[in-house]
């Protein structure tokens, strides 16, 4: 079993009054045995040598927004789905994360509308493309062979976030949030941070409000990916109607995992 790795980087956790034990966990992030990627999109251009981007048809690929607007002063990238049904925009890091290395990803996002849209944030066994990880959410079927993600899909019966995963083409038992759960669904033009933390063949799912406060309970899925398979941290957004385009903004994209020989 790999060593434990920090899955919660929120400022609220540091200020939670739990003392030196919590602080020591955060010091782990500066140790030599952690591989990490942290992007606040402050450079003015997307690092295309690192990211794979996909934009179908009339969709607009992710690009850095001008920092002049106060809403973008922390560095923001935007992807646009276009107004064609089932058209998508997606962004991923390379295929170099593993459950065996306890890889974690965190994405702070906001979306322009929460009707006729599908959003996935998580790990998958291919880089960004026009195909999502989850085909259908009500009775989950998958395009990926291995991977797990937070999924929100207005084509589903319940319009809330669901934690889903697939291991060697076998679907895990997912969890769909109740409508009464904290952070159960995206809120229009409001930031939320979604975290997926792999632990060998399993994964933990958590979510945080715009000010970094934890929302609801952490969810654990078992057998939701194959720990030895390389996965790509990915954000995928798909239009679910042909009448209106959807924008998704990403404030930060983080990934970290254990470094091993």
Stretch-by-stretch model annotation:
Residues 164-193:
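Short, aromatic/His-centered strand-loop micro-motif at the edge of beta-sheets
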Residues 47-75:
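Extracellular glycan-recognition surfaces and repeat-rich motifs
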Residues 190-204:
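Localized edge beta-strand/strand-to-loop motifs within extracellular or lumenal beta-rich domains
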Residues 78-161:
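Secretory/extracellular carbohydrate-interaction modules
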Residues 240-251:
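Extracellular carbohydrate recognition
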């Amino acid at each position: 079993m790999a060593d434990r790795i920090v899955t919660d980087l929120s400022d609220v956790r540091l200020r939670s009054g739990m003392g030196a034990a919590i602080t020591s966990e955060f010091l782990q992030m500066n140790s030599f045995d952690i591989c990490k990627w942290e992007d606040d999109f402050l450079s003015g251009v997307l690092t295309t040598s690192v990211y794979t981007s996909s934009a179908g048809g009339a969709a607009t690929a992710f690009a850095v927004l001008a920092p002049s607007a106060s809403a973008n002063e922390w560095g923001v990238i935007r992807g646009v789905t276009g107004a064609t049904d089932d058209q998508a925009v997606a962004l991923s890091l390379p295929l170099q994360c593993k459950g065996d290395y306890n890889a974690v990803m965190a994405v702070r996002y906001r979306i322009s509308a929460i009707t006729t849209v599908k959003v996935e944030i998580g790990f998958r066994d291919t880089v960004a493309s026009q195909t999502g990880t989850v085909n259908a959410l009500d009775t989950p079927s998958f395009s990926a062979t291995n991977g797990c993600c937070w999924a929100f899909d207005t084509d589903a019966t319940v319009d809330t976030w669901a934690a889903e995963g697939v291991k060697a083409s076998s679907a895990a038992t997912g969890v769909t949030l109740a409508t009464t759960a904290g952070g159960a669904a995206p809120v229009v033009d409001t930031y939320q941070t979604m975290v997926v933390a792999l632990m060998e063949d399993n994964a933990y799912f958590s979510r945080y409000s715009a000010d970094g406060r934890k929302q609801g309970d952490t969810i654990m899925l078992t057998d939701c990916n194959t720990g030895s398979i390389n996965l790509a941290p990915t954000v995928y957004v798909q239009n679910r109607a042909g009448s209106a385009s959807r924008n998704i903004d990403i404030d930060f994209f983080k990934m970290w995992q254990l470094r091993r020989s």
